[in-house]
UniProtKB/Swiss-Prot annotation:
Reactions that this protein is recorded to catalyse: [protein]-peptidylproline (omega=180) = [protein]-peptidylproline (omega=0)
Region (Disordered): 443-462
Protein name listed in UniProt: Trigger factor
Annotated gene: tig
Chief place of localization: cytoplasm
GO MF term set: peptidyl-prolyl cis-trans isomerase activity; protein folding chaperone; ribosome binding
Length: 462
């Protein structure tokens, strides 16, 4: 087998491989001889089938196996002899002329093909000196704990049925209703319900809906007209007027919830003090998670600005395709277009291309940093992640577990974010971190990019 490098440009490599006809013939004969020893064909004694007969029957299929084995061998040889780190699977090009391929398959001519691949870049990690990030922290106030306690009390509020002639719905009542909603005279998906409980004044339904039920008598019906908010989550309903035919089936008046130790015991806690401590711990966990999202984004921004290196085009294209498929799926589901977002498809493609490049860059960087630092993910950690994933599919836990166990690539997708978080923590220990106390509103301020890119690089770690 002769291997010649024909291209070395940036991260692109290309090699020409020539397998002499004599080598092909030798490999074919070896396979036929092995088959002859085991072949059982009517009319011939075991092990005595003429090679020529076997070749006539199976020669072409065996030669296909020989060629595939030679291609795999060439790929391994190229990687090992040149100490390459391939970024993805190679592209194999066979002879364009059918006659050439036929001659090679008959071992009458040399078999030549090309192997093209991209390699991973060499990243000079260096030190993280000069990288500084700010970590936002917020304290949990007693008022915040009170809000949660009061919300729990509201959720467990007792209700007493309101019965008799002349009973009408008032604010605070729990109304049980049937309703059918229509837009332009046509019923729409999700616009109907039966036996639905609604606390009037809770703001659970579309603005204006609950207020129009006040004063409605038990058993009576009323037509309610509302307009969906312009920013309604279902874009095809946003800003549209809807008419609901509502029937009041039952009413219940609100009682009072006493917030004491007995109330706390209803939530499995020893007393009210323990309940408040538990609530505080939960809020602190939420704040810590929000803080992590923000400082992680800041750290990734700093790393993205610090490091510049060539990216394998294949990985970028793969990441972009994954992003674009999600964008198209979201548009299809929401009914919104690029014009609705104030942009064009061309501009959106350019923006998402930059995001794909960023994700690949950070993924490759974190992979190299983790490798240099000896970061490992234990099987127990992957199994725990798999357990949590399976729990999110009640009744199908075993099916989910078995799927991941049988699909290494799926398991790798579970492993990647765990590995990434460990590498991020390692880098955090090496950079300068300054804690900054802020109000909870600043810490929890909605930032789509925090959510979008909190785990943005893990795709490139798979």
């Amino acid at each position: 087998m002769q291997v010649t490098e024909t291209l070395s440009q940036g991260l692109k490599r290309e090699f020409q491989v020539v397998l002499p006809a004599t080598d092909l013939a030798t490999r074919l004969d070896s396979q036929l001889a092995e088959m002859r020893a085991k072949a059982r064909i009517n009319g011939f004694r075991p092990g005595k089938v003429p090679v020529a007969h076997l070749k006539r029957l199976y020669g072409r299929s065996i030669m296909a196996e020989v060629v595939q084995e030679a291609v795999n061998e060439a790929h391994r040889k190229i990687i090992e002899d040149n100490a390459l780190r391939p970024a993805s699977q190679p592209k194999i090009d066979f002879p364009g002329e059918k006659d050439e391929l036929e001659k090679a398959f008959e071992a009458k001519a040399d078999f030549a093909f090309t192997v093209a691949l991209e390699v991973l870049p060499k990243i000079e990690i260096g030190s993280f000196e000069g990288v500084e990030i700010e970590r936002l922290v917020a304290a949990v106030s007693e008022d915040e704990i009170d809000l949660v306690v009061n919300r729990l009390a509201e959720q467990s509020r007792p209700y007493t049925p309101k019965e008799g002639d002349g009973v009408v719905a008032t604010k605070g009542d729990k109304a049980t209703i049937d309703f059918v909603g229509k837009i332009d005279g046509e019923a729409f998906e999700g616009g109907s319900g039966e036996g639905v409980d609604l606390v009037l004044g809770s703001g659970s339904f579309i603005p204006g809906f609950e207020e129009q039920l006040e004063g409605l008598k038990l058993g009576d019906s009323r037509t309610v007209t509302v307009t969906f908010p312009d920013d309604y989550s279902a874009a095809h309903l946003a800003g549209k007027e809807a008419v609901f035919d509502v029937t009041l089936k039952a009413l219940a008046a609100p009682g009072e919830t006493v917030i004491d130790d007995a109330f706390a015991k209803g939530y499995g806690l020893e007393d009210l003090t323990k309940l408040r401590e538990s609530i505080k711990a939960n809020i602190e966990r939420d704040y810590a998670a929000a803080s992590r999202r923000k400082w992680k984004r800041a750290l990734l921004d700093a790393l993205d600005a610090k490091y510049a290196f060539d990216l394998p085009e294949g990985l970028v294209a793969q990441e972009f395709d994954a992003i674009w498929r999600r964008v198209e799926a979201e548009q299809s589901q929401s009914g919104r277009s690029f014009a609705d977002e104030g942009t064009t498809e061309e501009a959106a493609r350019a923006d998402y291309r930059k995001i794909a490049e960023r994700r690949v860059r950070l993924g490759l960087l974190l992979a190299d940093v983790g490798d240099a630092a000896g970061v490992k993910v234990a099987d127990e950690e992957v199994n725990q992640a798999l357990f949590e994933r399976a729990r999110s599919f009640p009744g199908q836990e075993k099916m989910v577990w078995d799927y991941y166990q049988k699909n290494p690539s799926a398991l790798a997708e579970l492993r990647a974010p765990i590995y990434e978080e460990k590498v991020v923590d390692h880098i955090l220990s090496l950079v300068k971190v300054t804690d900054k106390a802020v109000p909870k509103e600043e810490l929890l301020a909605a930032d789509e990019e925090d959510e979008e890119e909190a785990a943005e690089s893990s795709a490139a770690l798979v």
